[in-house]
Amino acid sequence: MKKTKFVNLSIISLIFFIFTDVFVSHSSPAYSTDNSAEPINTENTDFNCYRQYPETKYPEAKSYCHALANTRNAEFHQIWKDLTAIIKDNRKIKWEDDKIKSRLLVATWTGWNGYDDKIGKDFVTATQDIWVTVAPELQDFCKPFSMTERKKITIPYRINQLLGIPPEASEKINKRKVVQIWVDKKDLFIPTPDPEITDHEAEVNFPELSGFILITNEYKSWFLKQLMANYYPWTKLGYTYDWGKHSDWGKIDPSRPVNVGLSEFIIRENAPLKVESISSAENYCK
């Protein structure tokens, strides 16, 4: 049994390194002043995406299609060195009962109704990962979004862009809500080759084996499955790919690189949680 497991893990490692060479290699990111001026990666762009998301129905949808191409590979020059680090010195983090060693507040943007009866209650996650951002970063972004801008792009649609979620029709996107959750930091990881949550920047490859960093074969297997199955513009560098207008960051973080959204984390499955609040995008962003 042990021999079989060893062989399986060896195969997983071999496959991963093959895929790493494919996915973490040669690509040009969309670093422009406006997403409407993105360079089109025609080599990687799936033109079926244009047909699936026509701009007559989905505003700025071509930028989403370009995002899929531009995040297919992760490169060193795409690394952002100001990721949110989960450390005690980070004063922007909200800790439960204001105790640094307690749970911290995160937010997920979801259309799932399973949280609705759990406000104020402790529960355990289902057998799936939950992609989240650290509160109040989403709120800090969407509050300054002006009424003039909202007439062109609705708040829910802009949040989809910010978080690298596909364009959605109004009947679907209007079912989404912001769920704020208390979670222990030990149950969080960053979806990058190095899942450590205390870092300000990500790695494009798995760290070399050392006495300080241990990347398990189980995590490598999870990462490989994401590479093969993920159909969102996943940067693999610890931040969401914002395919919306970069000018929206002008009031919040003018120096932010184009297409860099929010730092993203994942709550591992079977983690104990507590729902703090559930809000519509409009109420959350007041």
Predicted regions and their residues:
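C-terminal segment of classical bacterial N-terminal signal peptides
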Residues: 17-27
